[in-house]
């Protein structure tokens, strides 16, 4: 049976994001992946803040200055017979809810681990989010051109800390100055590493077979013997790769390499296009939507301001779930019930825009947004349904925001509400006073908000510390009990940017006590958009 042209396009798509702790090498790996996809000819390395070769995926002004990727950008490139969509996620010490939300728009994730450090804090947090949907995970152990921890130990740590089984696909031969390459367990081939070839795709020398005397000549007798010993151990002690278990998020194929030296990235990409799922079905409030359906549907998972410094526009990023987008098609924005003609959707190559003529399930397209689109919005060809699973996450950090010029209160509120619709930050207005409290998942979000208020809304503001430890969205089925709760806790209650009632707790102890005192009230950590 031959697939229809539409289904062939769907089957070609692979949509993934990279998750890692800051400085594990995510931006470098993004560069190298794009290089293999022929999207950029010479990969611009991130380091050297003053250098003019900026990495392609970091494009907002603040990112250019700091050398970090604040905003989730989207890049599409061909690889083998597939079209790969890579969603870049902010990886810096400081990231935001956007990072969490981006993970709801992909079918698979690549986890990048610094092999000298192992599993780190941010990686744990992001893995928790992927668990909400049992997303399949591939793993890349990076930085083999440095001295690393014992590879077996690294696998044990991933298994114990992240509760996912590891199936090594490649195995390293030496590390640091002695790094010689990797052996592929399933192809029975050794790929030899050459230094100094990081900016281009290098011709790799391949030695077939583990017992081939060429291997001993190439890496030295000692390392060759060590490799054979380690592989005996690995084959006995580790898991075999199983695609079904990979698709259900229970096992991760592990690749070793160095993104900086551009070695091993292609092995990982080969695994990605071969094993990662084509666009997956999505749950709505009424039914499951399959990618094979001909009618268009999609949801907005992030809104981005100022991709074009010359224009104050905002772009809503939409994941296509089913059907084909064609230029000029009419779509219904389900939340408002309005039909809109989309004639100028964008595709991305990180900050370079090109207008898109068509897009298929798994693709990400950008819609121009003048304040009418919100995160979580569903677009269809008329069907009234809402995709679920694009949450707001309870902030972990809070500041009170004050104006330098009290006459600009209106602009400040407008700016904050727009930034909160975009998911840049969350805003809370306490019921008992006129304060404005800003909540974020990472500290850098506060700086981003401050600089954007200044450049986009001409508002100069300052932050003050505020006695808030955490926030929870509250609801209750019993109206009478809810009224009593609201009356007695007015001082702790606030409305968020979307006018949802929120309990703002000064301490975790206070939150726990309040939850015990009001068992009928639900306190939520995430809220569907």
From Swiss-Prot:
Binding of GTP, residues: 20-27, 88-92, 142-145
- Where does this one sit in the cell? Cytoplasm
Q: Which GO terms describe its cellular component?
A: cytosol
Q: Which GO terms describe its biological process?
A: regulation of translational termination
A Pfam cross-reference name: GTP_EFTU
Primary location recorded for the protein, binned into one broad class: cytoplasm
- Tagged with keyword Cytoplasm: yes
Sorted keywords for this record are:
Cytoplasm, GTP-binding, Nucleotide-binding, Protein biosynthesis
The protein's GO terms of the molecular function aspect are:
GTP binding; GTPase activity; guanosine tetraphosphate binding; translation release factor activity, codon nonspecific; translation release factor activity, codon specific
This protein's source sits in the domain of life called: Bacteria
* tr-type G domain: residues covered: 11-280
Indicate the family of this protein: Belongs to the TRAFAC class translation factor GTPase superfamily. Classic translation factor GTPase family. PrfC subfamily.
Q: What does this protein do?
A: Increases the formation of ribosomal termination complexes and stimulates activities of RF-1 and RF-2. It binds guanine nucleotides and has strong preference for UGA stop codons. It may interact directly with the ribosome. The stimulation of RF-1 and RF-2 is significantly reduced by GTP and GDP, but not by GMP.
NCBIfam families reported for this sequence: prfC, PRK00741.1, small_GTP
Name recorded for this polypeptide = Peptide chain release factor 3
Q: Which organism is it from?
A: Cronobacter sakazakii (strain ATCC BAA-894)
**Which taxonomic lineage does the organism of this UniProt entry have?**
Bacteria, Pseudomonadati, Pseudomonadota, Gammaproteobacteria, Enterobacterales
